[in-house]
């Protein structure tokens, strides 16, 4: 039997996952993180993208987060996300359209253009699309 750690994934809308996992894989500010039982305590911010949970028995479940924070304690991992979606609920066509709209917004600069907001929308759309493609490639979803 594999060693497990308790994991919670929550957003402003509420808790989307709570349970025992063998590993949490997330995209932190400085790169990808693999968190398992006994990991050193840590707090880091998370970039938009997939969070993969390896549950008891090896089953994987993937979520998309738009950014947030990860807290690691000896027996607990908590993801506090701005928004969370189950990756299976993401629509690839919608993600493609959002990416194109964000790219177009960057090229159509006006006097009141907010480059930071446009860049954030582009990064989020690209992360959603990357999550959908990762699911399709690795998990046949």
From Swiss-Prot:
Q: Record's GO cellular component, any one?
A: plasma membrane
Query: CDD domains attached here?
Result: F1-ATPase_delta
* Coiled-coil regions listed in the entry: none
Q: List the disulfide bonds.
A: none
MF terms in GO: ATP binding; proton-transporting ATP synthase activity, rotational mechanism
Q: Which SUPFAM superfamilies match?
A: Epsilon subunit of F1F0-ATP synthase C-terminal domain, Epsilon subunit of F1F0-ATP synthase N-terminal domain
Topology of the protein relative to the lipid bilayer: Peripheral membrane protein
Q: Which UniProt keywords apply?
A: ATP synthesis, Cell inner membrane, Cell membrane, CF(1), Hydrogen ion transport, Ion transport, Membrane, Transport
Q: Belongs to which family?
A: Belongs to the ATPase epsilon chain family.
What name does this protein carry? ATP synthase epsilon chain
């Amino acid at each position: 039997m594999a060693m497990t750690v308790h994991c919670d994934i929550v957003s402003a809308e509420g808790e989307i996952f709570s349970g025992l996992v063998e590993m949490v894989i997330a995209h932190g500010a400085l790169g990808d993180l693999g968190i398992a039982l006994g990991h050193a305590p840590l707090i880091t911010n998370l970039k938009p993208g997939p969070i993969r949970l390896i549950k008891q028995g090896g089953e994987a479940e993937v979520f998309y987060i738009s950014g947030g924070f990860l807290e690691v304690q000896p027996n607990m991992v908590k993801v506090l996300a701005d928004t969370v979606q189950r990756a299976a609920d993401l629509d690839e066509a919608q993600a493609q359209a959002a990416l194109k709209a964000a790219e177009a917004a960057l090229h159509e600069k006006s006097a009141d253009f907010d480059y930071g907001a446009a860049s954030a929308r582009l990064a989020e759309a690209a992360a959603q699309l990357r999550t959908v493609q990762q699911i399709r490639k690795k998990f046949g979803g």
